[in-house]
Amino acid sequence: VLSIPHSCQALNVTTNAKKTMTKIFTLIICFGIMQTTFGQMTTEKEKSLQTVLDKTVDNKKVFGTSFAFKKDTLIWQGSAGNMTIDQPYFIASTTKLFTTAIILKLRAEGKLSLDDKISKYIDKSILSELHIYKEKDYSQELTIKHLLSHTSGLPDYFQGKGTSGKSLENEITEGNDQFWTFEQAIERTKKMTPLFAPGTKGKANYSDANFQLLGKIIETITHKTYAENCNEFIIQPLGLTKTYLYQDLTDKIPKKLYYKSNELNIPKAMTSFGADGGMVSTSTDMLIFIEAFFTGKLFPSTYIDELQEWNNIFFPMQSGIGIHLFKLPWIFNPTGAVPYFIGHSGLSGALAYFSPKENIFIVGTVNQVSHPDISFKTMIKLTQQLKKK
């Protein structure tokens, strides 16, 4: 029996990440006594899981949610509010798992090494003065691994403040939808100050510029677009039916995002994210994807251990190589009843994670930009219900 005192803990957390947790959020975890047991899904168990989603939708912060998980041969899917199980939604920075998978596939094919300098693939004009820290130019020292692990020291073009004093995130959530190109994202990055020299021990800084560069590297090596690479390496092999890179401004298929109580209509921005956050998917498709990612169906499974080289990035998350670690601190999880998860999440409230300890794959979204933290609470509550006897 895994027991935790009946208490409700509140933890104020400040983050720098664009698509995981922004600003200051309160992570509230209410623990009760639970037992670890898995077996056949009962009607009562299904109802308890559905109740978690029903209660998540309050029509104030969350208007719709969709989640799915797999434990061994047990699969459950549910939705609530204005979303259905098969409703496509923006997965935001969870897209980075797609980018990571493609990079690792290219590595397996011998087309790149994680230690390659990115100058091998990126034009000099793009790299020129990209990373100047304490009057030294480190631009030519950046490697693919630095980008994947957010240890490049590059600032975040999306969440960092520009010359206007506002971040792109601020501008977009205030209603100023806008386009940007890869080149513009990098130019914006150059106008900001790097945080540390590439590969500084114990240092990591979440930056979408890293994955903009990785997307360009993928296109340079393959001579194909990022979307074409996603189709070739991931979507077609896995038989995903509702997963694609958002590129068409007139595409109304994905569920509109919410920012606080209002719909957030930002098609221009969503077509601009690309390799750092532009994918659309469903919980059904994402469950297939996250299992494939961690079981060797997309790249050699032996790579997974290598990816787990953790650096603190924003509490309670840690950054590995292309993946994140979500692990509650001991004070809030003294018996380890809530397992750690590895995967990724996004500002939209989307996430895709795997619990190695429990062999649980879980994906979903709360589709709320102002409260992406709620998706983590939902993930924890679903896991608790699944583990209750």
Where do the model's predicted regions map?
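Short, surface-exposed beta-strand/loop micro-motifs that present aromatic residues
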Residues: 340-343, 348-361
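Short N-terminal segments immediately surrounding and downstream of signal-peptide cleavage
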Residues: 41-58
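A short, well-structured edge-of-sheet supersecondary motif
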Residues: 53-84, 88-90, 179, 323-325, ...
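Short active-site loop at a secondary-structure junction
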Residues: 59-64, 81-146, 197-207, 274-277, ...
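Bacterial Sec-dependent N-terminal signal peptides
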Residues: 1-44
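Residue-level preference for non-acidic, small/hydrophobic
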Residues: 53, 67, 72, 96-99, ...
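Short, surface-exposed loop or secondary-structure junction motifs
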Residues: 130-342
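Short, gly/Ser/Thr-rich active-site loops of penicillin-recognizing serine hydrolases
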Residues: 328, 370-389
